[in-house]
Amino acid sequence: VVEDDLGELIYLADPPGTSGHVVSLRVLARPAPGGDVLDCEFVVETETVKGSFPVYLTSDDLDDWEEALGALAGNRFVSWLNSGRTVQFKIKPVSPGGIAVSVHDGPSSQVTVSVPLFPATGWIDDQRARLEKVRRLFSG
C-alpha cells in the first residue's frame, strides 16, 4: 500500500490473503492557513464494491474520534460523526477479533456500506498513532 504524504486517519483492513476488505479515511489536503477544516474521504473496498465518500473534519471531530477509540478499546460499539452534516461512521465489535464497520452517507446519497473486518492485533493502537499524525497537520 502506497500512502500519500498526508496519510490516513483510519486504516482498517483484513489480513493479507483473506477477503481484502479495507475501510480507510484518507486525508486529501492540509487545512488552509488559519483554517480548521481537514479535507478527507472515506474509502470502502470489498471484492464487489469500491466507494468513496467526501468528508470534512474539524479538530473537534478528531477529539471525538479519540474518545471513540477509547470506547473501542473497551470492546464497545461506537458511532462517530453523528452531527448529520457529513458521513456517519460506526464500528461494532462482533466476535473475538472481528468488527462490523459501516459508513452511512446521510446528507448526500443515503447509501450505507457495511463491511465485516478482522483487523490485525493492535489495530486500535495503530489508529491512535494515525490520529496523532493527523493532529499535527492542524498545528502546522
Please describe what each predicted stretch is.
Residues G7, G20-S24:
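N-terminal intrinsically disordered, cationic/polar leader segments
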Residues A32-G74:
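Short, well-structured hydrophobic secondary-structure segments
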Residues V49, A71-R76, S108-Q110, R136:
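Short loop/beta submotifs within extracellular cysteine-rich repeat domains
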